Each structure stands twice: as C-alpha cells, then as structure tokens.
Amino acid sequence: MYGMVNKAIEDLVVKNFGPEKWSAIKEKAGVDVDVFLSNEGYPDKVTYDLVGAASEVLGMSARDILIAFGEHWVLHTARQGYGSMLEANGRTLPEFLLNLPSFHSRVAMIFPDLQPPRFSCTDVKDGEMMLHYHSHRPGLTDFVVGLLQGLGKMFGTPVEIAVAELKSEGADHDVFQVRWSQAAPA
Ligand code: HEM
C-alpha cells in the first residue's frame, strides 16, 4: 500500500501515545523504515505487521486499532491532505456513500498504482442502505467500520453500522447495514 497509509498509522500513534510507543511498535514489527514516503509503495505486510505490533505494544485489540485508524483516516488524514476531494464527493452522509463506488477512481489519478477497494450500495431507503465492500485484502472489515463512523462524525450525522455478511465467514464479500438519522443542526 502507498506510504500514506503507514504514515497515517504513525500519526495516530504519535498523537495519542507519543513517539516512544511508535518506535517500540516499529521495532516489534521489524520495520526498519525511518520515514514513510506518501507516494511510494510498500508491501501490504508492512501495514499488517504495524497493526499487529501496535496491538501488542498498546494492549489494544486489532479490532479497536483498525476502528480508531478508520476514524483517524477520515477525520485527520483525508481531511488535511484531500479535503476538497472529500467535499466534492457529497454534502450529506447518504450522498457521500452513494458516490463512494467511484471515489477511489479519482484517488487513482493521484496514486496511479492504487489497488483500491470496491464499494456498491443496494437496498437504498430513507435512513438506511446496504454497503458492499470488495477487496483482495483480508482483515480490513473493522477499518471500514471506523471509516464509516468517521464519516458520520464528519457530517454530524449519527450512524449505526451492523455487519450483515463477512467474507471471513464464507460470504462473497463484506456487507454492512448502514443506518443514519438526521444530521444535527449546525
Ligand atoms: C481523500 C480521501 C481518501 C484517499 C486519498 C484514499 C486513499 C487510499 C489509499 C492510498 C489506499 C491504499 C491502497 C493502495 O495503496 O493500494 C486506500 C485504501 C483504502 N481505502 Fe481509501 N482513500 C480515501 C478515502 C476513503 C474513504 C472515504 C473510504 C471508505 C469509506 C476508503 C476506503 C478504503 C479502504 C477500505 C482501503 C483499504 C484497501 C482495501 O480494502 O483493499 N477510503 N485509500
């Protein structure tokens, strides 16, 4: 994955737990990289090893780390570096989710070697939809939950996410039931 992913994990850890913990996590993961370059590709293993080591060093489950990382990705990483792209993708949570299927094709204009996830929306109703997530990468279901929670916070829209189907349990791909209520008045 592009270095910006590993950089974002570093940012999350350093902001919340300090630079010493980040050094300990890199050492435990056996990752010998001083500075991750956003535009450079790194093996996916580096990212998985960092999450595994963070779980051990911080005494948190990998699930909680991936959820926190998903929220951080939306609320800090994406907002700071790519705010206009986020804004262009929708003015409300449901609008943003309906446009999610084409979102990473715009990201791929900046990151040409991107291997993006694929999303689609079905059963779209007032306040509810099924969001389908396809990826060749295993183990990122909780990252998606965190991303969706982050989007809810970004739009000030209370959101509930329930996992309806899991690839890790034999389904074709992960499916989330996403329910939202009216955005809080600004
Ligand atoms: C401007 C905002 C965003 C940027 C710049 C961005 C960029 C990226 C990049 C660079 C990767 C790594 C993939 C690779 O290197 O091959 C990635 C992965 C991913 N992105 Fe985004 N992304 C953004 C927003 C989002 C949003 C809003 C969602 C969903 C709600 C999302 C879902 C994912 C997922 C699930 C992955 C993990 C890869 C996988 O599942 O295979 N991203 N994204």
Question: Which residues are covered by each model-predicted region?
Answer:
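Amphipathic interaction/junction segments at domain boundaries or subunit interfaces
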Residues: 47-141, 165
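Short terminal or interdomain "cap/linker" segment that borders an active site or interface and mediates
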Residues: 4-5, 114-132, 137, 141, ...
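Generic solvent-exposed, charged/amphipathic alpha-helical segments
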Residues: 10, 14, 101, 145-152
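Long amphipathic alpha-helical segments
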Residues: 21-22, 26-59
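Charged, compositionally biased N-terminal leader segments and the immediate start
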Residues: 1-33
